[in-house]
Curated annotation (Swiss-Prot):
Positions of the Glutaredoxin domain: 1-85
Transmembrane segments: none
Family note: Belongs to the glutaredoxin family.
Family matches, as SUPFAM superfamilies: Thioredoxin-like
Keyword annotations from UniProtKB, A to Z: Cytoplasm, Disulfide bond, Electron transport, Redox-active center, Transport
Annotated GO MF terms: electron transfer activity; protein-disulfide reductase activity
Coiled coil (UniProt feature): none
Protein name from the UniProt record: Thioredoxin
NCBIfam families named in the record: redox_disulf_1
Lineage: Archaea, Methanobacteriati, Methanobacteriota, Methanomada group, Methanococci
Protein backbone atom coordinates (compact mmCIF):
# COMPACT_ATOMS: atom_id res chain seq x y z
CA UNK A 1 0.00 0.00 0.00
CA UNK A 2 1.37 3.40 -0.90
CA UNK A 3 1.38 6.09 1.74
CA UNK A 4 -0.69 9.25 1.69
CA UNK A 5 1.57 12.31 1.95
CA UNK A 6 0.45 15.00 4.37
CA UNK A 7 2.21 18.36 4.35
CA UNK A 8 1.33 20.62 7.27
CA UNK A 9 2.20 24.27 6.72
CA UNK A 10 2.67 26.27 9.91
CA UNK A 11 4.38 29.36 11.27
CA UNK A 12 5.88 30.02 14.71
CA UNK A 13 3.36 32.73 15.68
CA UNK A 14 0.27 30.87 14.46
CA UNK A 15 -2.25 30.37 17.30
CA UNK A 16 -4.10 27.47 15.59
CA UNK A 17 -1.07 25.56 14.31
CA UNK A 18 -0.43 23.54 17.50
CA UNK A 19 -4.00 22.17 17.32
CA UNK A 20 -3.53 21.19 13.67
CA UNK A 21 -0.19 19.56 14.48
CA UNK A 22 -1.77 17.55 17.32
CA UNK A 23 -4.50 16.25 14.99
CA UNK A 24 -1.98 15.32 12.28
CA UNK A 25 0.33 13.59 14.80
CA UNK A 26 -2.55 11.68 16.36
CA UNK A 27 -3.77 10.42 12.98
CA UNK A 28 -0.23 9.60 11.82
CA UNK A 29 0.35 7.57 15.00
CA UNK A 30 -2.88 5.64 14.45
CA UNK A 31 -2.23 5.05 10.74
CA UNK A 32 1.58 4.70 10.51
CA UNK A 33 1.49 2.42 7.46
CA UNK A 34 -0.82 4.75 5.55
CA UNK A 35 0.56 8.22 6.24
CA UNK A 36 3.81 10.11 5.65
CA UNK A 37 3.96 13.55 7.27
CA UNK A 38 6.11 16.57 6.48
CA UNK A 39 5.98 19.73 8.60
CA UNK A 40 6.79 22.94 6.75
CA UNK A 41 7.45 26.26 8.47
CA UNK A 42 6.36 28.92 5.96
CA UNK A 43 8.84 31.41 7.44
CA UNK A 44 11.72 29.05 6.62
CA UNK A 45 10.30 27.75 3.34
CA UNK A 46 8.11 30.44 1.74
CA UNK A 47 8.76 29.07 -1.76
CA UNK A 48 7.03 25.78 -0.94
CA UNK A 49 3.99 27.66 0.41
CA UNK A 50 3.91 29.80 -2.75
CA UNK A 51 3.88 26.66 -4.91
CA UNK A 52 0.51 25.75 -3.40
CA UNK A 53 -0.77 29.33 -3.19
CA UNK A 54 -0.96 29.12 0.60
CA UNK A 55 -1.90 32.44 2.18
CA UNK A 56 -2.90 31.28 5.68
CA UNK A 57 -1.72 28.75 8.23
CA UNK A 58 -2.29 26.12 9.31
CA UNK A 59 -2.88 24.57 5.90
CA UNK A 60 -2.86 20.85 5.23
CA UNK A 61 -1.94 19.55 1.79
CA UNK A 62 -2.71 15.90 1.04
CA UNK A 63 -1.02 14.25 -1.95
CA UNK A 64 -0.40 17.67 -3.48
CA UNK A 65 -3.93 19.05 -3.00
CA UNK A 66 -4.77 21.78 -0.50
CA UNK A 67 -7.33 19.98 1.67
CA UNK A 68 -7.75 22.03 4.85
CA UNK A 69 -7.15 25.66 5.74
CA UNK A 70 -7.29 25.81 9.51
CA UNK A 71 -7.14 22.92 11.96
CA UNK A 72 -9.40 20.05 10.87
CA UNK A 73 -11.15 17.66 13.18
CA UNK A 74 -9.52 14.27 13.52
CA UNK A 75 -12.53 12.67 11.82
CA UNK A 76 -12.31 15.01 8.81
CA UNK A 77 -8.59 14.31 8.38
CA UNK A 78 -9.07 10.53 8.63
CA UNK A 79 -11.87 10.72 6.05
CA UNK A 80 -9.68 12.74 3.66
CA UNK A 81 -6.87 10.20 4.03
CA UNK A 82 -9.13 7.19 3.51
CA UNK A 83 -10.44 8.70 0.26
CA UNK A 84 -6.88 8.56 -1.07
CA UNK A 85 -5.94 5.05 0.01
Amino acid sequence: MSKVKIELFTSPMCPHCPAAKRVVEEVANEMPDAVEVEYINVMENPQKAMEYGIMAVPTIVINGDVEFIGAPTKEALVEAIKKRL
